[in-house]
């Protein structure tokens, strides 16, 4: 882990930053250096790759993925950790299909995820977050969509999203299916969570993008189900 030191001379300031092993020679002046008992630092993270389509910057990979064709990790809506199974019994906000969730319900009136419950934001930092329903809609309006069973000879099926005005701008959403007691429908169905809850008065459900073959739907799956996450970079 690299460490950074600022050297302060009487009337000016010298700074040196590097991620590599290096040595520095300071000007021939006297200086003093205050060293605190504790040093707090934020790691320098490389920028996450993205493609800009329809005025929004979309990550090229899912949360937990190592490549665009990797499905990555599955998360229940509003949860920030993976699990061995996804059910109402172990859902973070509790409840069941009839309601009773402790947050994002008809009482608190919250209509989108708080950042503390947004795994994209917590994983990537900065302005990264889970997209809203409207942002996914804008993406699809600005692009053409094509189902493929073998994206770029990878053997992975999913949805290819190509910018209507620049066909070099392409997103691929792997068809990762869904996760309950196990993973189902990989390669045939894709689900991706929005940050928006569903229709008012139905707090047990949340909006998601759903695609299979040539069809694109917008169902309201149960919030406990595990889906992949495709982040967006906010302003």
What is each PLM-predicted segment?
Residues 1-29, 33-37, 177-181:
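Extracellular/surface-exposed low-complexity repeats and stalk/linker segments enriched in Gly/Pro
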Residues 38-235:
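C-terminal, surface-exposed recognition/capping segments
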